[in-house]
Amino acid sequence: MQTRFPPIALVMFLITGLTPFFSTAQPVMPDYTAVTDERLLNPEARNWLSYRGTLDGWGFSRLDEIDDSNVQQLEPVWSFSTGVLGGHEAPPIVNNGVMFVTTPGNLVYAIDAASGDLLWRYQHDLPETYIAFHRTNRGVALYGDKVYTATLDARVVALDATTGRKVWDSTVQDNNFGYYITMAPLAIDGKILVGTSGGELGIRGFIVALDAETGEEVWRTYTVPAPGEPGNATWPGESWRTGGAAVWVPGHYDGELGLAYFGTGNPGPWIGDQRPGDNLYTNSVLALDIKTGEIRAHHQYHWNGSWDWDEVSTPILMPVERQGRLIDALVHPGRNGYLWTLERSADDISFVDAEPYVYQNAFASIDPETGRPTYDPEHKPTTGSTTSFCPSLWGGKDWPPAAYNPETGLLYIPANDNHCGVIEGRDVTYMPGSAYMGARTQMTVPEGADHIGEIQAWDMNTGEEVWTREFDSHNWGGILTTSGNLIFSGGTSDRLFRAHNASTGELLWEFKTNSGIIGVPSTFSVDGKQYVAVQAGWGVDAAGMTARLDMVRGTRTFVPQGGVIWVFALPN
């Protein structure tokens, strides 16, 4: 069986048709603890209950058995082959010794987190043909006694956490029109929140909340406003119907304000002169009332986007001091190459400042009051012309998450510098389920560039970069940081999983896995012993960027394929 991908000059995937599968390898731990709002908002250090460990998106753990003095002794204690090829991006999610992991193609594994023994496996029944540019998945959400996963055919499935059996299955949109889901859901307030991918397929983005018990729709908020809704005037004619603004990275949540924050993607088609206007709410952060879905506030990072710089990564909710005042900030290392600091409140998102953290030549200036950029017309793609710009469409940071450590006070960014792009703008006609970009792309590297990938550490109170580590390869590795004064990440084509000193950036430990790592790391403890976990499995845009760099550099980089969950600990 062949998965139907839309026609596009990108890597095509031949997917074997999947059939439903469920198995129980051994009894699941009988003391599975229900996941409540209280636990999600104040998780125990031993668990990793959500995508970034906490709903503020820090990617930080208070565990410190593994620290900067002993991490050199870290060793693998078990590994588990997923049996799946392609890019493995999901973090291992852990609740009281039970690990939940997803793979490309919508498999969900429940595993004994200490031993690596399989507890159950669920394989989603995908149709014989479905439309998706990427078949990856970014993980599960836990709530109550259920595990929630979102699928490539635009469904959300609730599974019994102890058995893996399906409880409910809800369709959120029609995959035939290019809607598909790769994100991990956000679970809070009795609701399961998801958006969809498909920004290159002429979709109209949205965020939908489903009842966690029944799967029934509670509310739906579109990220491109229709006539009569605020912001529709920023779209000419009927262009809002296919305007994009996809939501494909999990949101974060402020429990005191009752607001869920989500980032949105690029407009469609890619070239801005085909849809003049600001094109709200593309390339923005939205604050949604968790009860109603009402958009309470927004900030648009760049208007009338023409570079494919999705700003889907949700800002980190963290404290930042500015001019002697502590603010509740939203901090966002943008794909557009700027590091954004915003202030959040119950009914507003206000601009604080923005500075480039990689080389960027498309913005001529940024308004110091509003944060609205002014563009250099030489570097803004237009229809019928070929335009160069920096960074390339993959941006200063794509979706892999940054992290914040409150003990070092530093923000850690998986960045890419020294790469630029070329877009040839073309007219395009919308056809349901087909590519709707109107662009031909290339990648370039400035002469003399000695590296691409970086890990940057920033003190957001001073707005200064404290240290940087450079890699010859691009860096596609989400970051985990801990109370052990450590950061963990993969992301480079050399297959290495690394630990750095969180204060200085010194490399302390590395381990070569079976494949490149684009999975997001997590950490947890069982019976008082700390573990660090990550999925290896190269693919998706990281592999695409590797191929583009090889073309530019005249190199041939081989990265083995295949998904493996790796779990590390100190020797007993």
Positions of PLM-derived features:
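Extracytoplasmic beta-rich repeat domains
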Residues: F80-I93, R121-A141, K166-A184, L201, ...
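Repeat-solenoid scaffold signature
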Residues: Y180-T214, W303-A364, E378-C390, W394-W399, ...
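Blade-level signature of beta-propeller repeat domains, shared across WD40, Kelch, NHL, RCC1
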Residues: S522-N572
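Repeat-blade elements of multi-bladed beta-propeller folds
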Residues: W48-R52, G87-L107, I131-V156, Y180-R204, ...
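Blade/loop signatures of beta-propeller domains
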Residues: Q26-P76, T223-P230, P373-H379, T444-V445, ...
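Short, conserved, GDST-rich strand-edge loop motifs in beta-rich repeat architectures
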Residues: V194-G205, F262-N279, D417-G448, G537-T557
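Beta-propeller blade signature
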Residues: L159, G205-E216, D278-G293, E343, ...
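N-terminal cofactor/phosphate-binding cores enriched in small/glycine residues
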Residues: G57-Q173, T481-T482
